[in-house]
């Protein structure tokens, strides 16, 4: 199996200095590519000088996460892509090898992620993926090891199991599977694109398996490109999650899911005012403004009516705030 490790970068020279040496050390000789979204901070010249073994693909502009990977992966001849954030690093070389072994042993597994641990506090999982992703009735993602903002200890959930989505912080995916659904939705730019991709793969064939690999770990710093408190980040999250629902849900579930989502977002809007979180407030308003203007442009994909086999048919918000269920094993 031909494997390529692919790192997307935009003005991340300081992150490359920190994480590329560790990646090379743990790469087991697999090809490493950096797909650069037209950086202006000398990222390219730095890589060429310091790490000539790293292969560089340069995009003409900043296409975001979705478009950047779509453009870059088209140019790479490989059977398996391991897409890694520029602010992440593998625990050791066994972590990469254990990912490859899973794909070699089971052809029905088309995408996967390692356990994603917080780089700054390794006792806890990272927000972006933890030990595998799921989604609730209203399109809110949560993780095995992270529900909303409650993050669990990283010593938990160390088994390999099937999940709904694999995190974009470290997403391993077969090239033929990626191409079978035309890759990421470039209109997302960033955020939720990996969940949408996994959902479309499930809609294409419910037998497609997406897993978290329990004996593989990545440390993720987070906020490498978009600041965690960015209003633009909240805008993308709210907008893209609703677009994802419209695209992928079975018709019979559309109304109840979108109505419940609207009510939940209304509560979030009120809460953001009361707590003076204006980044959330303006991000949410901007998302609904976009959706109102572009409502007739949203396109659906063929949905799989067996979605209930891999979809959490309840509200994670309700369980979290009204039933105090903040631990994955309790839901």
Predicted regions and their residues:
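Active-site-adjacent helix/loop segment of glycosyltransferases
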Residues: 203-300, 305-315
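Conserved donor NDP-sugar-binding/catalytic core segment of glycosyltransferases
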Residues: 89-129, 133-140
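A conserved acidic beta->alpha catalytic loop
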Residues: 13, 22, 36-45, 61, ...
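Short, acidic, metal-binding catalytic loop of nucleotide-sugar glycosyltransferases
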Residues: 21-30
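A recurrent flexible, glycine/aromatic-enriched loop bordering the glycosyltransferase active site
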Residues: 137-143, 148-173, 195-197, 226-228, ...
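A short, conserved alpha-helix in the catalytic core of glycosyltransferases
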Residues: 158-217
